[in-house]
Regions:
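Metal-dependent nuclease catalytic cores that hydrolyze phosphodiester bonds in DNA/RNA
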Residues: 1-45, 172-174
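Intrinsic-disorder/low-complexity loop/linker signature
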Residues: 15, 31, 64-65, 104-106, ...
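A structural signal for short, well-ordered beta-strand segments and their strand-loop junctions
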Residues: 20, 43, 47-51, 97-101
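Short, solvent-exposed loop/turn segments at secondary-structure junctions
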Residues: 26-28, 54-56, 104-107
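Conserved catalytic cores of phosphodiester-cleaving nucleases, focusing on short active-site segments
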Residues: 40-72, 89
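A short acidic, glycine-rich active-site loop
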Residues: 67-83
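Metal-dependent nuclease catalytic regions and adjoining charged, substrate-binding loops involved
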Residues: 76-78, 90-174
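Structured soluble/peripheral alpha/beta segments that form catalytic or ligand/cofactor-binding pockets
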Residues: 84-88
Length: 174
């Protein structure tokens, strides 16, 4: 059903326009050594769309040794990390941005009428992202690629990130 909902979203956003999926894009600041690379989920001549699926989660029935699949709620606002990702695709294409979330029951679509997908916000997010990446490149050069030296300059990872660091054991988290 999730796939059917994705088709509904694509029809709602793009109508009968021809689509390209998973196109690679690359960009960098003039001072950067390496390109930033990404893949646009869906793209037409006029718009881009980033898809985020919310699959059901496995839950245990209270007091029983039974499990069931529970629908994951759709967000009421775009996630800032997803808007940041979309900012890169927007920078590369300058096409109308869409961010959608879909589960097996429904979907929600955000477009540039939302503050987090506005042109100004996306450009600001792209600038923040590229400045961070440029700083990392310069730091790697300064440390001559020595990971031990580099680790002294790094801030600790965000262990509460929605999809990174899920499988760390307690020793790694410390």
């Amino acid at each position: 059903q999730t796939i059917q909902n994705i088709f509904k979203v694509l029809k709602e956003i793009f109508g009968n326009e021809k689509l390209v999926a998973e196109r690679y894009v690359a960009a960098k600041l003039k001072d950067m050594l390496h390109d930033i690379i990404g893949r646009i989920d869906y793209e037409s001549n006029n718009a881009i769309a980033e898809a985020k699926t919310k699959p059901p989660s496995l839950r245990k029935k209270k007091g029983k040794d039974e499990y069931y699949l529970a629908t994951t709620n759709l967000p009421t606002e775009p996630d800032h990390l997803h808007a940041s990702q979309l900012s890169f695709y927007y920078h590369c294409t300058k096409r109308k941005p869409f961010l959608f979330y879909v589960n097996e029951k429904d979907y929600v679509i955000f477009d540039d009428s939302h503050e987090l997908l506005s042109k100004d916000y996306l450009e600001e997010q792209y600038n923040i992202m590229t400045k961070k990446l440029l700083s990392w490149e310069q730091l790697i050069i300064f440390c001559k690629g020595d990971l031990n030296k580099l680790a002294h300059f790094a801030e600790p990872p965000e262990l509460n990130h929605p999809f990174y660091y899920r499988d760390l054991i307690q020793q790694q988290k410390q």
